[in-house]
């Protein structure tokens, strides 16, 4: 049983309104970033007289990024709305798990598009793949912009996931170690 009451425990709730504001702001910032990523990617196409038309739906990594961006935007909107409802705010574990899932999905799509962009920009000479960005420069530039926006979206969700982890685990007290037990060893 604890005999010492931590004075910082009463100050623990002092930062919650600021944390809620930061969390909500990040969620709301992720929405236009995700929508912009989708719009840039879906409208991206370029025609080359030698190789033909290249569209986003020719590349599975870009289709995956559009899908994850749509999921990020919808989830961010839903989570921001749910954070205003008091019964959902008390369910920190729901936000923790769902924020983790969305952050992981976002990083997987960033990695997939980054790999695709690297191959398009540099090629893979050992596999006899030539680089494609010299032929499709505008397409590659828009993919790069979409990748940057999606990476910023991931960063938002990473910070959101850290905040939700803090909320979920801050309700537990740290383990108590009796000083006599430590000295006795």
From Swiss-Prot:
Residues 37-64, 114-145 are extracellular. It is found in: Cell membrane. Residues 1-15, 86-92, 167-185 are cytoplasmic. PANTHER family: CASP-LIKE PROTEIN 2C1-RELATED, CASP-LIKE PROTEIN 4A4. InterPro entries: CASP/CASPL, CASP_dom. The chain crosses the membrane at residues 16-36, 65-85, 93-113, 146-166. One of its GO terms (cellular component) is plasma membrane. It comes from Glycine max. Signal peptide: none annotated. Belongs to the Casparian strip membrane proteins (CASP) family. It is a multi-pass membrane protein. Homodimer and heterodimers. The keyword Transcription regulation does not apply. This is CASP-like protein 2D1. Pfam families: CASP_dom. Keywords: Cell membrane, Glycoprotein, Membrane, Transmembrane, Transmembrane helix. Its main location: membrane. Glycans are attached at residues 48, 58.
């Amino acid at each position: 049983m604890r005999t010492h009451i931590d004075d910082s425990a009463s100050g623990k709730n002092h930062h919650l309104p600021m944390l809620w504001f930061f969390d909500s702001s990040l969620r709301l910032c992720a929405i236009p970033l995700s929508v912009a990523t989708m719009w840039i990617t879906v409208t991206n196409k370029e025609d080359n007289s030698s190789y033909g038309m290249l569209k986003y739906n020719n590349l599975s990594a870009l289709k995956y990024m559009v899908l994850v961006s749509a999921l990020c935007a919808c989830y961010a909107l839903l989570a921001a709305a749910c954070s205003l409802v008091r019964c959902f705010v008390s369910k920190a574990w729901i936000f923790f798990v769902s924020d983790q899932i969305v952050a992981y999905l976002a990083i997987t799509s960033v990695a997939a598009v980054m790999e695709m962009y690297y191959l398009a920009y540099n090629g893979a000479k050992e596999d006899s793949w030539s680089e494609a960005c010299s032929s499709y420069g505008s397409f590659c530039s828009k993919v790069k912009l979409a990748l940057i926006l999606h990476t910023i979206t991931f960063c938002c969700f990473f910070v959101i996931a850290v905040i939700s982890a803090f909320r979920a685990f801050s309700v537990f007290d740290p383990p108590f170690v009796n000083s006599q037990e430590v000295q006795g060893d």
